[in-house]
Amino acid sequence: MSKFPTVSEILSGKIVVGEKVTVRGWVRTRRDSKAGLSFLTVYDGSCFEPIQVIINNDLANYQTEILRLTAGCSVIVTGNIVESPASGQAVELQALEVEVVGWVDDPDTYPMAAKRHSIEYLREVAHLRPRTNLIGAVARVRHCLAQAIHRFFNGQGFYWVATPLITASDTEGAGEMFRVSTLDLENLPRTEHGKIDYSQDFFGKEAFLTVSGQLNGESYACALSKVYTFGPTFRAENSNTTRHLAEFWMVEPEFAFATLADNAKLAEDMLKYVFKAVLEERKDDMQFFAKHIDKEVITRLENFIAAPFAQVDYSDAIEILLKSGKKFEFPVAWGVDLSSEHERFLAEEHFKSPVVVKNYPKDIKAFYMRLNDDGKTVAAMDVLAPGIGEIIGGSQREERLAVLDSRMIEMGLNPEDYWWYRDLRKYGTVPHAGFGLGFERLIVYVTGLQNIREVIPFPRAPRNANF
């Protein structure tokens, strides 16, 4: 065992009673008793609970330092592990020596003083908010989910591929992209027609931050068979909502020789795997979310794991919604995309389980989705989860060059701009499929938090790029 065990290792019983250890962390609270003892709670971020430290008043620095400790001070405590007489923790630390490493300059103005803070306030001090119970728990759950995703895909024989963050292609064809440029905004070069001359820019052409790693991922799937990307993506969508970020992380598997049915199975297996992992590996944090954020959060994940996914064609889903007798805020009609209220009705009230809606009208989906034989729909799917609605979107990709070209032209895109993507269809084309999972949306679902800005360390949104 390390000379400096974590609080998690101590509280989980990996250190035996009587052993001398050194703990390094930060003070959460200090309480003094009339009997000449002080009690500190010290956390190091390794788990939800802090460890209680008992300090006798005969320590050399008791009067000069211990009695001045406040929330946020950093300490190194050496002492013996003893059984705790109080309920709550099996063991505590009897201090032999306490070294104060860092003081809080002015405890009265310390932004993280030991009291309950609103979530809105914590966003204003995002550099300090990981010190709170809430954001500390979110950070550990985020880590657990990320590790589980990598483990899942590795176990399924997928290779992780790093796709570029700077791109010249718009995967979604929506045009909501951040431009990357080194041109002088005060003195933009112009063509003879008065347009900005991007040939003089860093890349010699227009460049953007990526909205998805999918197209690049497809090129590797058509060589390695099974790949996935997991990295940041960017959308310049002027949406200041609880569900949108300008910078977020995406998980995007792509696999060759795969159909839409294979895609739906992969999505189901992955979600159940990662939910099982977080319930087993982060029990302490999940209990906190169930107690303070959303009492249904653990039950919801357990039900998700236990339930087989329902599947329904988009056309049938529209019929279900029309016949439901329910008044929706947004109208229901074939050819219209499902809104969040429609998705949640299907998952929560009709199927009462996760549901895969598939075969959407081609006019509301992207150019790369495989055209079905009816000529009206594409082999697209959305996974809808009770409690949130859409959590995954994916499709079988269009592997036929002529069909892909006509879809691009139909949608006002220039096939030549995607010459390299078209090459994949020219040289040994193969049916393939994939999906995208917004990682932060997954964390929102797991934690029960209402706002996506709480589940990423430093949220980026319209008019907000602090820190």
Swiss-Prot record:
Assigned keywords, A-Z: Aminoacyl-tRNA synthetase, ATP-binding, Cytoplasm, Ligase, Nucleotide-binding, Protein biosynthesis
Source taxonomy: Bacteria, Pseudomonadati, Pseudomonadota, Gammaproteobacteria, Pasteurellales
InterPro entries assigned to the protein according to its UniProt record, in alphabetical order: Aa-tRNA-synt_II, aa-tRNA-synth_II, aa-tRNA-synth_II/BPL/LPL, Asn-tRNA-ligase, Asp/Asn-tRNA-synth_IIb, NA-bd_OB-fold, NA-bd_OB_tRNA
Localisation per UniProt entry: Cytoplasm
Entry keyword annotation includes Protein biosynthesis: yes
Gene3D superfamilies: Bira Bifunctional Protein, Domain 2, Nucleic acid-binding proteins
Reaction(s) catalysed by this chain's protein: tRNA(Asn) + L-asparagine + ATP = L-asparaginyl-tRNA(Asn) + AMP + diphosphate + H(+)
Family: Belongs to the class-II aminoacyl-tRNA synthetase family.
Enzyme Commission number: 6.1.1.22
Protein name: Asparagine--tRNA ligase
Molecular function GO terms recorded: asparagine-tRNA ligase activity; ATP binding; nucleic acid binding
Gene Ontology biological process terms from the UniProt entry: asparaginyl-tRNA aminoacylation
Organism listed in the record: Haemophilus ducreyi (strain 35000HP / ATCC 700724)
Pfam families: tRNA-synt_2, tRNA_anti-codon
GO cellular component term of the entry, any: cytoplasm
Record note on quaternary structure: Homodimer.
